[in-house]
Amino acid sequence: MIHVDSAAIDEVAYDAASRRLTIRFVHGGRYIYLDVPPRVARGLLAAPSHGRYFHDHIRDRYVFRH
């Protein structure tokens, strides 16, 4: 897991082989988003606001599990 400087997101991990993006949120909860393209995972890590990028590009767009 990679720690990110965000008010909403604590850590992020991406497995390119399975296209699974794991996000651990600051206020608890770990979610695994399925079939996330590498460009989206890279975008999350590179974004000036990780929380905004998550909201705009990941939330409600990918199937997830806890």
Residue ranges and their predicted role:
Residues 1-66:
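Acidic/histidine-enriched, beta-strand-rich ligand/metal-binding domains
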